[in-house]
Amino acid sequence: IKDISAFGSDPVIIATGATPRLLRKVPGYEKMIEGCDYLNGTEVGDTVAVIGGGLTGCEIAYELALQGKNPIIVEMKDDLVSQTGVCLANSSYLREWFALHKTPVYLETVLKEVRDGSIVCTGKDGKDINIDCDSVISCAGYIPAPLAEKSGKVHLVGDCLAVGNLRSVVWRAYDVAMKI
């Protein structure tokens, strides 16, 4: 289907998901591996900088550590997994696990450049930090990607409306389905 009007007056539910937020303003951004690409099998080195300490970034860092790799988390905010709607048991466990296993976590730190074999970040004190790494995984979030605008007969659900977690997107879809 190339045009929503092909459905006539029937309601249409669009669940086209989201696209990764690419950090195009960061020199060397093209050297990064997007989080979903890693999850789909893209190989990484032994020391991996994970850019983004939200749920996806932390779960990827956790998986890397379980595989015997050395993750390093770089997060702009002042805490890991700070988004709303995440199960407290998950976020608390991840924070505590990283602390217990001495996983390097850089909070209030911004990625400045991706180089071959390292990244340069700016810490909360304004000073640059050089972090050696073999690979860089970008987990900088997602941007809704709807195919059409919401209207009387067009309903957006899931990440194309607002990026969320599995629970929130399923709830939104259920609400729309019940209203139709």
Task: State the predicted function of each range.
Residues I1, A99-L111:
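A conserved beta-strand/loop element that lines the FAD pocket in flavoprotein oxidoreductases
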Residues I1-S5, P11, A15-K25, C36-G85, ...:
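Rossmann-like dinucleotide/flavin-binding elements
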Residues K25-G28, R95-K102, K150-S151:
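Short, conserved catalytic or adaptor-binding loops enriched in Gly and charged residues
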Residues Y29, T42-V48, E108, D116:
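Phosphate-coordination loops involved in phosphoryl transfer and adenosine-cofactor binding
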Residues I33, P104-Y106, H155:
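General small-molecule cofactor/ligand-binding pocket signal
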Residues L88-S92:
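Charged helix-capping and loop-helix junction motifs
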Residues L94-R95, V136:
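Acidic, Ser/Thr-rich peripheral helices and adjacent loops at domain boundaries
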Residues G117-T122:
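Short polybasic amphipathic segments
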